[in-house]
From Swiss-Prot:
The keyword Transferase applies. Keywords: Glycosyltransferase, Transferase. The keyword Transferase applies. Pfam families: Glycos_trans_3N, Glycos_transf_3, PYNP_C. Its EC number is 2.4.2.4. The gene is deoA. This is Thymidine phosphorylase. GO terms for molecular function: 1,4-alpha-oligoglucan phosphorylase activity; thymidine phosphorylase activity.
Length: 421
């Protein structure tokens, strides 16, 4: 088979056969194709798209390019929740103890942050939680506490890593079929009864519009249907930072406040999204007959002590110390802190969640290339959230870092603030 013929065929809008797609994925996996040839193929897909059969074949071949993980969930309903990436998105960390308190089993593989999107693994490691476990060790965690969050295995869908790196440098990141196959190949490599995807759209997401997110969801549903897997997708707005924090240890601190019901320290939007996600999981998995019953069950669970106890057990089993979570000053103790004040009175908004994320990265909370080191204590607290009324001189943002915070940091943060009188 010849890669030039495949590129030409897709370039002219013709559908590829399963044999051709399998050959392409196998050739990428064994490194027998040049990067420029793979890139040309990706660009042809970007222009011409893929039909549902091609998409299924591509995803299946990507799954088969690596290992699949099979865990024993001990007859409990198993759920995998995935977010397509957002700013201030700490939902997975808060969700796991609630779901296990509701008697679900949650085996989750997560990634690190890159660019303006934060990573769950970085957030957990910032508070001493270990995430590097073998499948056997992960099963042991599941046996003891019905859950784990570990780093993405190098052996799962290795072809996706190659394709993603090339998409990132060839302006083909926003190809919906390629996004769908990338996300689903990793989700399908693990056995779970249900896959829930929190699909973000807006200024802080790669889907800039709700229409684009809906189209991507249809690709994902098509793949799941052909694999005979249960998939539920929730579309959620990422035009604002989620919650009151951007960072690593700082976002875990907001999760702690949430689980301990210290509501003044938690963003109202984060509280609302958590309720929506859990109630939709309860309804979709038939644990609740309707929304009213699901909401009641969610609140009864959250208001009890079980989620907090499950969380402490989770972090302890994964190598951190539960004692440090009882003293929040030990959990989050940045060396430097600087307020950013309102210049006038009025109604607050922010230019973009991405702008805030870039300030956070400049403080040390993120990475622009994979080799960048992260400052676990760096980040931003949104003391005032969008649409709140502020007075001149009010603290709007607080900046944190382990290194001195410069006037340039404060100026950059001030540029993200809009106050309308």
């Amino acid at each position: 088979m010849n890669i030039v013929n495949l590129i030409s065929k897709k370039q002219r809008g013709k559908a590829l056969t399963e044999t051709e797609i399998n050959w392409f994925v196998h050739s990428v996996n064994n490194k027998s194709l040049a990067d420029y040839q793979v890139s040309a193929f990706l660009m042809a897909v970007w222009f011409q798209g893929m039909n549902s059969k091609e998409l299924f074949c591509l995803t299946k071949a990507m799954v088969k390019s690596g290992e699949s993980l099979h865990f024993n969930h001990h007859s409990k309903l198993s759920v995998d929740k995935h977010s397509t990436g957002g700013i201030g998105d700490k939902v997975s960390i808060a969700l796991i103890p609630i779901l296990t308190a509701l008697d679900y089993s949650v085996a989750k593989l997560s990634g690190r942050g890159l660019g303006y999107t934060g990573g769950t693994i970085d957030k957990l490691e910032a508070v001493g939680v270990k995430t590097d476990f073998t499948p056997t060790e992960a099963q042991n965690l599941l046996d003891q506490n019905d859950c784990f969050i570990i780093g993405q295995s190098e052996g799962i869908a290795p072809v996706d890593k190659v394709l993603y790196a090339l998409r990132d440098t060839t302006a083909t990141v926003d190809s919906l079929p390629l996004i769908a196959s990338s996300v689903m190949s990793k989700k399908l490599a693990i056995n779970n009864d249900y896959i829930f995807i929190d699909l973000k759209y807006g200024k802080g997401a790669f889907c800039k519009t709700k229409t684009m997110a809906k189209e991507l969801a249809q690709y994902m549903y098509s793949i799941a249907k052909q694999f005979k897997r249960k998939l539920y997708i929730k579309l959620s707005d990422m035009n604002q930072v989620l919650g009151k924090t951007i960072g690593n240890a700082l976002e875990v601190l907001e999760v702690v406040h949430f689980l301990k019901r210290n509501w003044t320290e938690v963003g109202a939007d984060f509280i609302q999204l958590m309720e929506q996600i859990v109630t939709e999981i309860l309804i979709e998995t038939k644990r609740a007959p309707n929304k009213r019953a699901a909401v009641a069950l969610y609140h009864a669970t959250l208001e009890g002590e079980k989620p907090w106890q499950r969380f402490l057990k989770f972090i302890e089993l994964q190598g951190s110390s539960w004692e440090r979570f009882l003293d929040l000053k030990e959990l989050f103790n940045p060396q430097y802190k600087a307020p950013v004040l309102a210049s006038q009175s009025g109604t607050l908004s922010y230019t973009s969640p991405v702008d805030l994320a870039m300030v956070s990265i400049s403080l040390g909370a993120g990475r622009m290339v994979k080799t960048d080191l992260i400052d676990p204590m760096a980040g931003i607290k949104l003391v005032k959230q969008a649409n709140e009324v502020v007075k001149a001189g009010d603290t709007v943002l607080e900046l944190y870092s382990s290194k001195p915070i410069t006037p340039a940091h404060i100026e950059a943060a001030q540029h993200t603030i809009i106050i309308k009188q």
